[in-house]
Amino acid sequence: MTFLDSSVIIDMLEGVPDVVEYVEDRGQPYLTSSVCVFEVIDGEVGSGSTDIVAVRQEFGGVRALDLNEQIALGAGRMQDQLMDDGERMAARDLLIAATARSTGDELIVADGDFETQLLTNLVDVTNLRGDD
């Protein structure tokens, strides 16, 4: 299984060649967080009449995992450790990372939002945009 951040889903939808190749080489099933589903949809809204269901169907092959209390507690523990190290992450990114961690799968991202030493010790994170 492969866990995709919204940045990767967006790049896949846009056909970014290196991202598409990397993800397809990993194989299905593709998983994501329900937070990522919202982030992708949020990037498409604004007309007042956006077909949200159609937007979601564009990446319908990616199964969303719901947030639950265990994931929220895991994210809280991660934030506690980060803050002890003098760092802090956005709540949404921690919820995504905690969801990925709950699966034990590689978290594939295409931005620098997940680059902390602690996080990379807890979750197998691959950043396809290492220079971001």
Question: Which residues does each predicted region cover?
Answer:
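Histidine- and aromatic-rich ligand-binding microenvironments
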Residues: L4-D5, T32-S33, M89-A90, D111, ...
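Short, well-structured N-terminal submotif of metal-dependent ribonuclease cores
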Residues: M1-T32, E44-Q57
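Conserved glycosyltransferase catalytic-site signature
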Residues: S6, E69, A91-L94
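Acidic, PIN/NYN-like endoribonuclease modules and their adjacent C-terminal/linker elements
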Residues: R101-D132
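Acidic catalytic patch
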Residues: R63-M83
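Acidic, metal-associated active-site segment
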Residues: V40, A90-E106
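A generic structural signal for short hydrophobic patches within well-formed alpha-helices
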Residues: I9-I10, V19, V37-V40, A72, ...
